[in-house]
């Protein structure tokens, strides 16, 4: 079992943790989040970005992690970036808690997400369904108020 965690911080009040667990390279990765400080009753883009570099805030994390050269999509789409986790849905206090199993996100193997950055966006991810070029790159999810590098944990 490999475990990793990202502690999210940023310019705004958004923060929290994202935990990753994977049994073997062929197994799905369980992703569990506990995020606070978002707008109430909102959907916010949730992605893994390429670089574990936050020297210039969350913008240094680069584009979505996309080792297979696919277009942006929903987590259930075959055509999606590895880093496309969709949207977090917040409650009436702006908090989001949840868990999902993802077949594309890996902690083990050549396309591991360890050392990359989890980003919470300020807008809703259109899941690649917007009718413009940016939708197929970013989902039009907007600015990056919080992020954290994915590190190995015990």
UniProtKB/Swiss-Prot annotation:
Give the function comment from the record. Answer: Destroys radicals which are normally produced within the cells and which are toxic to biological systems.
EC main class here is oxidoreductase
Look up keyword Chloroplast and say if it applies: no
This protein's species is Claviceps purpurea (strain 20.1)
A molecular function annotated in GO for this UniProt entry is: copper ion binding
Similarity comment text for this entry:
Belongs to the Cu-Zn superoxide dismutase family.
What keywords does the record list, in alphabetical order?
Antioxidant, Copper, Cytoplasm, Disulfide bond, Metal-binding, Oxidoreductase, Zinc
Q: Name one GO biological process term.
A: copper ion transport
What EC designation does it have?
1.15.1.1
UniProt keyword Cytoplasm present: yes
The name of this protein is Superoxide dismutase [Cu-Zn]
